[in-house]
Amino acid sequence: MASFIEDYALLSDMNTGALVSRSGSIDWFCAPRFDSRAVFAALLGEREHGRWLLAPLESVNPAPVEEVRTERSYRENTFILQTVWFVGEASVRVTEFMPLSGGTTIVRNVEGLTGDVTMYHELALRFDYGKTVPWVTRYEGVDATGAPDPSADMLVGMAGPHALVFRGDSLPEGDPESKAETFTVSAGQSYTFTLSYFASNHNPPAPVDYPTALTYTQEQWQEWSDLYSPADSLPEAEDEDAAPAHMPEGGQVPTGVRVSEQAEQAPATISAVREVEELEEAKTSSLLLETGSNTAAPEVDEATYHELAQTAASQVVAPTAEDHREEANARYREARLRSLLVLRALISRETGALVASVTTSLPEVLGGKRNYDFRFTWLRDVAMAMDVTLTHGHERETAQLRNWILRALANNPRRIHAVYGLAGEKDDIERRLALPGYEGSQPVRSGNGSGDQFQGDALGQVLVTFANLREAGVAEDHLSWPIQKALLNAATERIGDTDRSMWETFGEPAVYTHSQAMLWAAFDAGVSAVRDFGLDGDAATWEHCRDAVADDILSRGFNADLGCFVSTYGGTAVDASLLQLPQIGLVDWDDPRMLATVQRIEQTIAHPSGMIYRYDNSDSQDGFEGQDNPHFISSLWLAEQYIRSGREEDGRALLDTVLACANDLGLMSSEYDFDQQRLTGNFPQALAHISLIRVVEALGL
């Protein structure tokens, strides 16, 4: 049975990803791309659907004799996972990663730390989501002289066009469908295992050198993350009246930068704490002397001890509100950096696409039917990701995402899709897989049938992002501006059209306020391109359309009786997409109409935790019965709204709630089930992490 979603860690080589559980099992791995058919699919079924388990034997013992516990973390600013297993008094460290040096490989290294640990190793190779069991052959290695070399032995599994090669310091034996073994690791010993995918009409790839691959992969991740350095200190001013060089206009010190006279108190505080510690040691030494220790004790009587301890303790400065604020800021910066790394992990090096998630059919409601394939690329996700990569100086990734959008839209901008394949293909075929589903949640899908839906917000988001690129100095080329003009002309035909909203509901189509607002943003971007940047285009028509859509939204998308914006023209309900209205500049963050909309959201679609649902589904508007769970993306949009409209403390509180719901590695899925305290939905989700980055930026960190 699969682990809880929150127990999984992501490994990535920027072309595909794998999920490894806290129990040491890789239960999900698609090769060679994010959207390929799964090699390991136990996540959506059982062990016979494919997995790779590497863990202490005691951890899989139904009646363990010794206590087993784990500690895990990523190496700093990487996706190199390190898990320390403690088995009684003994321990081992398992290091796992996907090399960034080419190919499609998973590397797992077991290093003995203390004592002896017996490891259990099971390899169930599969193709086609567990349906195909490959023919596995063991090849005996030889050295340069032709003599047998057991260290070069390998297992090769093959079926049709697919093949896998497994190498290691100890190869598991067993029946054709599952290989298993045990081996003992002592302190100082190390075992390395690699699994590589390759096309069956090619030779197996060369062996991976563990130290070299580890060093290179770590350097690549850290080189990318080094572009983000949130902890830059303020430079010293030339005189006491001069403002720091990078202080914003108005002389405001950026949020999160601590400038306080209390910094001078730190040495005294530390000294006082040390004095208390020394007194404790003195008292302990005295007690040891009384019980026979040969350690000489300082001459401190009981009264003197208590007097000195009280004096020293009185000098200890309790953490201030500012201290707590800075601790929180440090957490937020760390969460933003991890989110940036998640974003990079989900951008395909091969195609430049951003995959929404590495998984399919993880249920938004456990046991329910809201199960979708997220191994696709949504235009809005790519557009919002470009804003992030551009802001953080990742020019290569910005160019990759930009070029992917242009290739995807070059087919026919007038028939824009919401969802595309990773190469920009339009594939609307959705099929059901013969898998049990995560905790029995059916159906299990391959493919996404919402691709042919028109979603006005996707068109608008793309044009807004290209406008941001222009503002940043990115020049238009022979393809980019003509495609944008085609999109703008197509948008003129979509004013007032019905759609199924950005939430892709299965209910009746309607005129969604958010979709129309994104058309407004598209026209506004087009007008600016001509008027402000001198590009050619029918600015007069686009300006007329922009103003007409704005009037329409303010008359039909705004409910005068409620005093707020509503989800659909003429409706009364609100949904989380309305939180994007100030993001695109249709209204100000603190516009009274927007504040009233926020209040309505709090009243109707908020969970007691402060997180919010996407919408109220009491009338089954999305085609399913019952309410889904609080939504990470929507909740983070609300947190940003709070911060930018002057409710910073509310924004921080909501951000804290969201971070508490992420897993121990800082990864988020689609939603969170508070009743069961479980992550739900596909994992990890790119747009959730993009939205978190926006919130931290709103705090000025």
Model segments located where?
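Acidic, mature catalytic/reactive cores of soluble proteins
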Residues: 1-701
